[in-house]
Structure formats: C-alpha cells, structure tokens
Amino acid sequence: MKRYGNLIHDIADPETIKLALHQAAIGKRHRKSVSRRLNHEEETIQQIQYLLLSGEFKPAKVKTWTAHEQDKDRQITTTPFFPDQIIHWSIMLVLQPIFLKSMYEYNLATVTGRGMAQGRKVIPKWLQNDPKRTKYCLKMDIHHFYASINTDILKLKLQHRFKDPQVLRLLGVIIDSYSPGLPLGLYTSQWLANFYLEDFDHQVKNDWRVPHYVRYMDDLVMLSGNKKKLHRARDQMDAYLKAEGLIIKSNWQLFRVGSRPIDFLGYRFYRDHVTLRRKLALRIRRKAAKVGRKDRLTYHDAASMISYWGWLKHTNSYGFYHKYVKPNCSIKKAKGIVKHENNLRNRTGW
C-alpha cells in the first residue's frame, strides 16, 4: 500500500483553508462566532495557516449533548467553529481523496454520492439479479462503535498510510484529545472511523468470500447462498473485530431471505418490493397529520415533509402517500417554501 507524504502544505494552503472555512460554516452563518470569521476571511485564513504549520494547534474542550435518534440516545460532540472545525475540514479536504482510493465500494456512510440512496438501489438489485447467492442474510452491528475504537491501533493504521510527520502529529493531537475512542459528531471522526474498518471490509469480500456485503458505519448486512459459510464468516468477523477492540452486538441475526424482510437503512427489503420501516412510516403519518392541522405550512415543517417524501418516493408506498400524506401536505408547495427561504438566506448571508 502506497504511503503518502508532503501533505501538510496542501492542508495549510490558503485555498484549502478558504474552502474549509465556507464548508464548516454551512448552516451556521447566522451565528455571531461564524459570521465574524467570514467577515474577516483573510485574517482567519492566516491564523489557521499559522496553527497548522507551526504545530501549535491544540484542540479546544468539547461540548456534548444527547440526541434522540430512532429510539437511541447518542452523545454528540461539538467543537468551536474557530479554529477546530475549520482545521478538521482543512485536513479532510486533503485526506478524503486518499481514503476514497482504497475504500470498499459498498461502504456507504459519510461519502457524498453513496449513503442510504445507494443502499436502497443495490440491495434490491442483488436480491432480484442473484437469487442463488442471496438466499440467506446475516445482519449485525457493532456495539458502541465510535467509543470502542482503539486509538493506538488507529494511529498505527494511519502511519501505514501516511508518512508526513506533521500530518501524523496533527492527527494524533486530535485523536488523543478525546476518550474513549472517537467522539461522535466531529467531521474527522466520520472519516477516521470508516478508515478504521477499511481492512475489515476488504477481508469480508476478498478473504472470507461473502458474495454480497454492505456496511453503513456500524451496521452490516451480508448475503450468501450458503448458511454454513455465513456462520463461519460471522465467527471470523467476531475474532477479527475483537482484536481491533470492537464487539458485535449479541442480537445479530441470520435468516432465510423470503421468510422475512431485510430491515436496513430505514427500509424493509423484500425480493420484489421495498417498504418503509414501520416506525418510520408511523413517524411520517403522525407528522403529516400534525402539519395538516396547522393553519399554514412553516419552513421547518416543509423541510421535514420534503425529507420524508425522499423516503417515500424510493419505496412501494403509493397507497400510503395518497392516504396519509397528500391530504395533509402538498409536496410541491413545501418545495416552493423551502426554495424561497433558501434563496432569501443566500441573499442575506444568513
């Protein structure tokens, strides 16, 4: 595997920092701490460049808050916009293309152009086009993935990929500033967590010969025509991940496709159709009813309904949409409201 060097000057390049500044500011321009930095762009770029090249950057203390997502409580970490978030973005703008070169094709999280949409396309494609090798499904996830990452192993993996001492020192300072593992919520954490399982992904496909495999961060789905081989692969995965400090949750499932759907990414995949996960369908139904009871459609409600429409249009939910959504909310009207508000924000810099 090629090792990459001479990267710190790319990370500290004024154009990289400028792009990082504006990327980190998306959705936050109304905050005083962010607008102040945008209004003094050149000064901000020079300060970030100095911190990167001098090696004087020290991560600030983080703040944590609890997010309730799909019946789970997650501890989300946030850092100051300046300098931390800008520096995280500067680093990843340069390292992303390197990570992508060796990233497994169906590792869906974090990467623009992949995500849930690609998972929605590829799983039905496998089920319909390769019925012999999709008879059985092994579904499992990793317990407390981010917090369980062994940072010593992570830094060793980074040393095998990069040889720029300043970049390795910078990454090490960021990684060592949080414990245990990697903090959920930081831009660097997403990419480093995916990188941590890169070797595992290729092991699943190339060494353990699982015909079809897809991963969305810590959620894994494998398909095969041989139940015994999936059981054997699961044992190999369990041993491999334990050596990396990771534990497969005890609620893993191995079942025959057709006896039940594959519940993954918010969808329920059958051989010949796709529906929404029941809890998600109920959430959409309740939101649509709530919107329908209001006198007017607000920006936030419109944005929510457009997001839900994105789920519905990729499933066989025609009847559900016409019964529960269409009578309460016009998607066309919602799109108009969001477009108008976004144009207004772009003009005002908000």
Predicted segment positions?
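Active-site-proximal segment of RNA-dependent polymerases
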Residues: R3-I8, M92-N150
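Short, conserved non-catalytic motifs in the polymerase core
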Residues: G27-S35, A60-I86, S102-R114, V173-N194
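Amphipathic alpha-helical blocks
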Residues: R37-K61
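Conserved polymerase palm-domain catalytic core
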Residues: L51, K121-M217, V221-Q236, F255-R256, ...
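A common structural junction motif
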Residues: D238-L246
